[in-house]
Regions:
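Extended beta-solenoid/beta-helix repeat architectures
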Residues: 113-115, 130
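N-terminal helix-cap/turn-to-beta initiation motif at the start of protein domains
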Residues: 16-17
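An accessory alpha-helical subdomain
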Residues: 1-12
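Flexible, glycine/small-residue-enriched loop-and-beta-strand segment within the central core
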Residues: 3, 30-40, 45-113, 139-140, ...
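Short-chain dehydrogenase/reductase
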Residues: 101, 119, 135-137
Length: 160
């Protein structure tokens, strides 16, 4: 839809998603497997070119920001080549707790919970749970440090 068609966007999201909080915004292009397994629970911003492979539930907490190009992938393929050639796969839920920020082009794998307030660096591959209140990044994604008072932007440095 065009940016000017906000009401139409809301109607599409209400129909597509399992739970769609009124303050959920998704920019195009957006792709998902089913939609009904995606649940937003407050202000949620899903930026351009995101993919959610929702073969299991995906719960997105209030205040979540998902940057451009992020992939939330509940599904996976068998590691064993014989099973993979038979089309055997796996699926596990993903949970983003409140106030999580996922950086651009990151991938979150099935079975992962990202704790409240955490930030995932751009380009990361998150294959294991991340605790609350930390900055984590890398391939594989690892905790770098806790978020502290020093991370607050000073009022004179706020641009918008």
């Amino acid at each position: 839809t065009a940016p000017s068609e906000q009401q139409k966007r809301r109607e599409i999201l209400q129909e597509l998603l399992g739970t769609c909080h009124p303050m959920t915004g998704i920019e195009p292009d957006f792709h998902c497997d089913y939609g009904f397994n995606i649940h937003t629970h407050g202000l949620t911003v899903i930026n351009y070119n995101c993919v959610i492979l929702d073969t299991s539930p995906v719960n997105i907490g209030a205040g979540a920001f998902i940057a451009p190009g992020v992939c939330l992938a509940c599904s996976g393929h068998a590691v064993d080549p014989g099973q993979r050639s038979q089309g055997i796969g796996t699926s596990a839920p993903i949970t983003l707790e409140e106030n999580v920020w996922i950086g651009a082009n990151a991938t979150v794998c099935g079975g992962v919970t990202i704790g409240a307030g955490s930030v995932i660096g751009a380009g990361s591959v998150v294959a294991h749970d991340i605790p609350a209140g930390v900055i984590a990044a890398g391939v594989p994604c690892q905790v770098i440090r806790p978020i502290t008072e020093k991370d607050k932007i000073r009022p004179e440095d706020i641009l918008f």
